[in-house]
A protein has these predicted regions:
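Charge-dense, helix-prone N-terminal extensions
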Residues: 1-110
Length: 110
């Protein structure tokens, strides 16, 4: 499983572009990171970081800990760590859509 799969699903969302974030492949929306491959040493290999709100993150980690997880470095950020090798396309699409809605809502509230 590679970022190519993430990219194919992500660019279907309005306004999403492919870019880099801390040197890693990323999807951005309005200049903000939506999803990127994890670069921090605490993350497992082949981990995708996706921006979502804290409540949804906590629910995902609690309900599907094999797919979604956290490390101390990421606790204060509105994001979830995702094991790309274990997530199917439907769940990945849903996650990216949630992140897209989160960033759109965040932008409207500014």
């Amino acid at each position: 499983v590679t970022f190519d799969r993430v990219q194919k699903l992500g660019v279907k969302l309005a306004g999403v572009v492919v870019d880099k974030y801390f040197g890693m492949p990323a999807l951005k929306l309005d200049g903000q990171m939506l999803a990127c491959m994890a670069s921090h040493k605490s993350a497992e290999p082949n981990t995708l970081v996706v921006r979502i709100d804290f409540l949804e993150r906590d629910l995902r980690v609690m309900n599907e800990p094999d797919i979604y997880y956290l490390k101390p470095h990421y606790l204060n950020y509105a994001c979830v760590l995702t094991r790309l090798s274990l997530i199917d396309d439907a769940a990945l699409r849903d996650l990216l859509e949630s992140g897209w809605r989160f960033l759109k809502k965040k932008k409207r509230s500014i």
